[in-house]
Design a protein with these regions (language model features):
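Conserved segment of the helicase C-terminal RecA-like domain
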Residues: 370-407
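Conserved interdomain hinge at the start of the Helicase C-terminal
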Residues: 244-301
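Conserved pre-motif I regulatory segment
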Residues: 9-60, 77
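Walker A/P-loop NTP-binding motif
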Residues: 45-57, 68-86, 108-113, 154, ...
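Conserved nucleic-acid-binding Ia/Ib motif block in the N-terminal RecA-like helicase ATPase lobe
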Residues: 29, 37, 85-156, 168-171, ...
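Post-DEXD/H (motif II) to motif III coupling segment of the RecA-like Helicase ATP-binding lobe
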Residues: 162-239
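Conserved helicase ATPase core of P-loop NTP-dependent helicases/translocases
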Residues: 133-137, 289-300, 305-343
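A short beta-strand element within the Helicase C-terminal
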Residues: 344-359, 381-385
Length: 408
């Protein structure tokens, strides 16, 4: 049985990290101060005030709540408390569903370890990067922390030398666990957990962060968490989900030939209402995303003056995708044409419009996409553009407040 569940009061006054003096290593406190982290978010406060930093926990938290620091800080505290730490082997293993989320976690980790002497190396193992180069760096280096996507870690574990690097684990974190299962990584996760030292024997700390806890995750928890693990939620059970609050509409088109003009009209109308339009347009495939990116890039966006136009799709190289993430996060306006490679773990601020072309692969995907706008009490809107044969999605999901519009 898990320990008592704790629901976080998100309206409570923010607690400063300085309160952790004497509990958190001085080098971690210095790094927090150096990088401008002053107050804990609610989820960070609850995790960091568990009886011990080594306690297993299941945490329900949405993207943008500060959950990355909520698992990195106790994991690093755990690691730095080890006498004669072997820095040549992995002490902390973090698994994430996408390359972009893995990179974000690694970037935060580098900030938190910036005041450590000698330094702790954080390595990343993700698809889309040069396997030979990264594996060689991993084997020759001192990868005290490893952030990986499941597929690439399975690939690494086929090498005896790589498996040896994972024999002294102190902490294993599953971030966006439900997203990893949604992406079909359940078999990979089971293979990974079967190939690293078993929790029952090695005694490593387990942490699982997930917005939802479906039955598939419940089945996997005994491999990651102790029976008496803490359970924390930042999700108010009385809070209406974003999908119930964001205005939603569908624009049916007579044929697929009308999709592009309709999307252009939707964006033009939105731009007329809001010159600082920042929109994500989800496309059916990577090829569609690339095509619309080039079309809108050459026609000046939805309307002059030109909006910045971006693309994010699986055919892009990892450096190009990383550059897009950084640029779209930094801009206050623009259009991002994306395939489903834009996973839930990627947090883009101030999105005021989401456009979905075609039906999502599943109901949850629709919910996740709508949830990219209208965050933190800000105004947002979601639009679908559907061909006649796709209108079944509306009648099959009458619980969504989707208004049916005539074609523009």
């Amino acid at each position: 049985m898990a320990g008592d569940s704790v629901v976080v009061d998100n309206s409570a006054p923010r607690v400063p990290y300085a309160q952790l003096a004497g509990r958190l290593k001085p080098q971690l406190l210095r790094a927090l101060e150096n990088h401008g982290f002053v107050h804990m978010t609610p989820v960070q406060e609850k995790v960091l005030h568990l009886p011990t930093f080594t306690q297993d926990c299941l945490v329900q938290a949405k993207t943008g709540t500060g959950k990355t620091l909520a698992f990195l800080l106790p994991a690093l505290q755990n690691l730095l408390s080890v006498p004669d730490l072997d820095r040549s082997t992995v002490g902390i293993l973090v698994l994430a569903p996408t390359r972009e989320l893995a990179q974000q976690i690694a970037d935060e980790c580098d900030k938190l370890t910036s005041a450590c002497t000698p330094p702790l190396e954080c390595h990343i193992a993700v698809g889309g990067s040069n396997r030979k180069t990264h594996l060689s760096k991993f084997l020759r280096g001192k990868p005290t922390i490893l952030v990986a996507t499941p597929g690439r870690l399975i690939d690494y574990l086929s090498e005896d030398a790589a498996r040896q690097k994972l024999t002294k684990l102190r902490c294993v974190v599953l971030d966006e666990a439900d997203r990893m299962l949604d992406a079909g990584f359940a078999p990979d996760l089971r293979r990974i957990l079967a190939q690293i030292p078993p929790k029952a024997e090695a005694g490593w700390q387990g942490m699982c962060f997930s917005a939802t806890v479906p039955p598939e995750i419940q089945k996997m928890l005994p491999m990651v968490l102790d029976k008496d693990h803490a359970r924390i939620s930042t999700i108010d059970p009385n809070e209406a989900p974003t999908v119930a609050l964001v205005p939603q509409s569908v624009f049916p088109v007579a044929s697929v030939d009308d999709i592009l003009p309709t999307v252009h009209s939707v964006l033009a109308c939105a731009r007329a209402d809001n010159p600082a339009l920042k929109a994500v347009i989800f496309c059916p495939t990577a090829r569609h995303a690339a095509l619309l990116y080039h079309i809108f890039g050459h026609t000046g966006g939805a309307a002059p003056p030109k909006l910045p136009v971006f693309q994010m799709q699986s055919r892009m190289s990892q450096p190009a995708r990383t550059r897009t993430v950084d640029e779209f996060k930094a801009t206050d306006r623009g259009l991002l044409f994306a395939s489903d490679v834009v996973g839930r773990g990627m947090d883009f601020p101030d999105i005021n419009l989401v456009v979905q072309i075609g039906v999502p692969s599943e109901k949850d995907q629709y919910v996740h996409r709508v949830g990219r706008t209208g965050r933190a009490g800000k105004v947002g809107e979601a639009v679908m553009v559907l061909a006649p044969e796709e209108m079944w999605f509306i009648s099959a999901n009458k619980d969504f407040p989707i208004k049916n519009n005539c074609p523009l």
